[in-house]
Amino acid sequence: MTTTRIGRLAALLLVAVLAVAVVALSACGSGSGTAASSSPSAASAAGPITVTDDSGAQVTLDKPATHIVSLAPANTEIAYAIGAGSKMVAGTSYDDYPAEAKALPKIGDFANPNVEKIASYSPDLVLAAGGIQDSLRTKLESLGMTVYVVDPTTYDGAIATIENVGKLAGVESGATAVADKMTAAQQEVQAKVGDLPKATTFLEIYGKPLMTAGTGTFINDMIGIAGGDNIGAQAGKGFPNFSTEVLVKDDPQVYIADSGSMSKPGDIKTRAGFADLTAVKDGHVYVIEDSIIARPGPRLAEGLVALAGMIHPEAAAAQ
């Protein structure tokens, strides 16, 4: 397995594997279910900024952050997208988007960030992930660092988190612009597919063993918004293993694999039992770029539109 492949799996699946004893993009993983929110004081640049992160913890800064360390690729994407890129002082070895993020000093990888390196940058805000990084939060806070956990369980939750990070970083207008684009994409998709019958859909996160997106994940939520009925939801929370026998029995109408698991749709025909799936016989097997559905950041809007185009291609293409 290549280093790139290991990194992708760590960032996408490792959080959830520990949480449900099987697997982690968002840099995924399922959170506590607490929606990120902000208090009225968050809007005031003159006083303390207080928001509630995806773990349910209140996060307060006396003033907007100027030195931000990101512990997950999705968090780095958020910072750059909302106009806080100049405030970034370090990120992980997996940060590859946008291009300028590659030049950031590294504090380690997603699964094993180096606490000493993080502290050496004297951050006034650390953007962490949930699950595997839960214990890390305690260590960082014991050293006096302020930590915001990015771990949304829904598409709307991802939008709320982006807005919260914007408040903490003092770039609310940039965050609002990103949030508006994500909301517009959601409304466009819902207008096209919202009244259509749900198409049974399976989304493959990993092929060996077969893994999918279950309940309590923003991917599951996005499949529903895009007009799909996620058969992976029956397997439980997070990113569980999924039985091939159950897959064949449920026979999804649409089969979507992330690009890190399958390179081209035709690959599925080489798997025992898969050639007889309705999705395969009807030509409804697709490969989707993993970073636009696995990272809970601004590009989820692109991922949502792509999912709708795969689940309901004719309706999604209509003007």
Question: Which residues are covered by each model-predicted region?
Answer:
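Proline-aspartate-enriched helix->loop->beta-strand connector
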Residues: 112-131, 145, 243-257
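Short secondary-structure boundary segments
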Residues: 72, 92, 130, 205, ...
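Short helix-initiation/N-cap motifs at beta->coil->alpha
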Residues: 54-56, 107-116, 153, 235-244
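Alpha-helical, coiled-coil/dimerization segments enriched in small aliphatic residues
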Residues: 94-97, 212-240
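A ligand-binding cleft/hinge motif common to bilobed small-molecule-binding domains
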Residues: 133-142, 254-271
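Extracytoplasmic substrate-binding proteins
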Residues: 30, 58, 124, 135-208, ...
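Bacterial Sec-exported substrate-binding components of ABC uptake systems
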Residues: 2-74, 173-202, 310-319
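A short, structured surface patch at a secondary-structure boundary
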Residues: 67-121, 125-130, 231
